[in-house]
Amino acid sequence: MIVLEVRNLAGGEVLHACPQNASDRPLPCIVFYHGFTSSKLVYSYFAVALAEAGFRVIMPDAPEHGARYFGDEKGRMQRFWPILLQNFAEFTALRAAIAGRGWIADDRLAVAGASMGGMTALGIMTHHPQLKSVACLMGSGYFSSLAQSLFLHPPWTRSS
């Protein structure tokens, strides 16, 4: 059995999952990021599986996604890279809030994600050497080359 709940952490809504009866006990902790145009709820099956394995999982919504989505789909498609960079910037406060609650056992904090979330995990890794582990599923660390092709020209502006 697990606990799966929405909490406010570091000024934002996160999905929090952990084994039952361990809500306030230190555990190995994973911050998991979702993919572009998705949300923490769509990726919640990762939180469930990891909590069942004994981890604490924190899943934030990226800017303009999930609970933070404000309805501008066309605009969001133009802002992939700023959203990714904001994920990086927000991690420091999120990590501090998780640590401040005493939720991390023995400094065992990892970051993971899928697609844009995997790219987020890789970017965070470059500035947080204290992380114990990083997992990138279906993402890429080739930011410089991707910036030349990924979301450079949105599909609705291209001619056939």
PLM ranges: what are they?
Residues 1-24:
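N-terminal cap/lid segment of alpha/beta-hydrolase-fold proteins
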Residues 25-35:
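Short beta-strand element of the alpha/beta-hydrolase
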Residues 36-48:
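The serine-hydrolase catalytic nucleophile loop
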Residues 38-39, 65, 142:
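Active-site loop signature of alpha/beta-hydrolase-fold enzymes
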Residues 49-73:
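Conserved alpha/beta-hydrolase
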Residues 78-102:
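Alpha/beta-hydrolase active-site loop
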Residues 94-154:
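Primarily recognizes the serine-hydrolase "nucleophile elbow" in alpha/beta-hydrolase
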Residues 157-160:
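Serine-hydrolase catalytic core
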